Each structure stands twice: as structure tokens, then as C-alpha cells.
Curated annotation (Swiss-Prot):
One of its GO terms (molecular function) is oxidoreductase activity, acting on NAD(P)H. Belongs to the nitroreductase family. The keyword Oxidoreductase applies. This is nitroreductase FRM2. It comes from Saccharomyces cerevisiae (strain ATCC 204508 / S288c). Pfam families: Nitroreductase. Type II nitroreductase, able to reduce 4-nitroquinoline N-oxide (4-NQO) into 4-aminoquinoline-N-oxide (4-AQO) via 4-hydroxyaminoquinoline (4-HAQO), using NADH as reductant. involved in the oxidative stress response. Plays a possible role in the metal stress response. Involved in negative regulation of fatty acid metabolism. Binds 1 FMN per subunit. It is found in: Cytoplasm; Nucleus. One of its GO terms (cellular component) is nucleus.
Length: 193
């Protein structure tokens, strides 16, 4: 296998899995999940080394309470289905944030680039989310990425800093079914000389 083979296989195998059970795979503990996310947060590059990425892992009663609040806020029975599934079928969720403080400081320190820094923060949080999702898949977990950001933020524990903006929720558990079949478009990559 080529030096990139394992990496590309991990990316290929990372899929959206909605059918979960609220368990961790045998031999995997919550500390493994925490350590994995921590290493990714620490080592994912950020603009000017601003280190804007943050994460909180919710499990147990906190997980159920937050997703119950999200489900309760949804206006229709159909809209409640996904947050109820997150609440009832997942083991936990990684809540991803960006800390707005470092981005605001960069905007003050480098006004000519001020408009670019929020985009940079968005790119780096996306990198953290996809890498975490891929790594959790390697641990034997299934996961799906949700974006109930404002609803989740309003239900978080009070000690989560106000300057942290919720970016997404990576809902995880043991997969109970294979992912749905994925179709691809032909993404041509041109090379110019």
C-alpha cells in the first residue's frame, strides 16, 4: 500500500451513520474519544497559530438533556425526529466551537486582513470536525454531523465560555447498520502547466 493508502482509506470509510446505539465499541473508552479529539484540536493548523478550536464532549444525562431541549424547540413532529434520534440512539456528542477572542485579536492586529480571519476560523473548524469524524470511525464508532448550533448553545452547561461559538455537533455511538449508498459526481481536477 502507498504511504497515503491508510489515510485515504480512512477518509473513504468515514461516512454519515444515523443508525446508532448508545454504547462505545468493546475496548474503547470515553478517554480514548477525549484523547483523540484533543490531539486533533491541538495539531490542526490555524491562521497565525491562533488556536481558535475548542470542543466539549457530552454524554449521559447532559447529552440527553441537551438533545431533549433541541427536540423540544423544533416546531413540528418531523423536525423533532433527528434531535430525538441523537438523544436516544447516540452515546454522546462532540460539540465543536470556535473561540471568537483570538479571531477578533487578529482582526485588530492585522486590519488589512480582518475580513479573512473569520473564513480562516471556519476552515480550521471544518478540518477539526472531519478529522475527528474520521478518527472516531477508526475507533469503531459511527457518527453523523449536526448543526443545531443556537439550540445546543442555549442548553449547554453555564461554564462554557460565552465567547465560544458553536459550529457543529458530531453525534457518535456504535453503528447498528451500514451507511446508505453514496453516489458521486465526477469531480475533475485539472492540472495546468
Amino acid at each position: 500500500m502507498s504511504p497515503t493508502g491508510n489515510y485515504l482509506n480512512a477518509i473513504t470509510n468515514r461516512r454519515t451513520i444515523y443508525n446508532l446505539k448508545p454504547e462505545l465499541p468493546q475496548g474503547v473508552g470515553l478517554d480514548d474519544v477525549k484523547r483523540t479529539v484533543h490531539v486533533i484540536l491541538k495539531n490542526t493548523p490555524t491562521a497565525f497559530n491562533s488556536q481558535v478550536n475548542r470542543a466539549v464532549i457530552i454524554v449521559g444525562d447532559t447529552h440527553k438533556r441537551i438533545w431533549d431541549a433541541v427536540a423540544s424547540a423544533m416546531p413540528t413532529a418531523e423536525a423533532k425526529k433527528r434531535p430525538e434520534s441523537c438523544r436516544d440512539e447516540a452515546y454522546g456528542s462532540v460539540i465543536f466551537f470556535t473561540d471568537e477572542g483570538p479571531t477578533e485579536k487578529l482582526q485588530r492586529d492585522f486590519p488589512a486582513l480582518a475580513a479573512a480571519f473569520p473564513t480562516c476560523a471556519a476552515h480550521t473548524t471544518g478540518a477539526v470536525q472531519i478529522q475527528s469524524w474520521t478518527a472516531l470511525e477508526l475507533l469503531g464508532l459511527g457518527a453523523n454531523l449536526q448543526h443545531y448550533n443556537d439550540y445546543v448553545k442555549s442548553a449547554l452547561p453555564q461554564d462554557v465560555p460565552i465567547a465560544w461559538t458553536v459550529q457543529s455537533q458530531l453525534v457518535f455511538g456504535v453503528p447498528t447498520a451500514l451507511p446508505e449508498e453514496k453516489t458521486f459526481i465526477n469531480n475533475v481536477i485539472n492540472v495546468y502547466h
